[in-house]
């Protein structure tokens, strides 16, 4: 999911 990539970036 796109959300996983967002939190993974942080």
UniProtKB/Swiss-Prot annotation:
Q: In which tissues is it expressed?
A: Expressed in the antennal lobe (at protein level).
Superkingdom of origin organism = Eukaryota
Is Secreted one of the keywords UniProt gives this record? yes
Residue numbers carrying Arginine amide: 10
- Where does the secretion signal sit in this chain? none
A Gene Ontology biological process noted in the UniProt record is: neuropeptide signaling pathway
The subcellular localization recorded is: Secreted
Q: Does the keyword Lipoprotein apply?
A: no
Q: Which UniProt keywords are listed?
A: Amidation, Neuropeptide, Secreted
Any one GO cellular component localisation term in the record? extracellular region
From the Swiss-Prot or TrEMBL record, give the protein name: Tachykinin-related peptide 4
């Amino acid at each position: 999911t796109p959300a996983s990539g967002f939190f993974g970036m942080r």
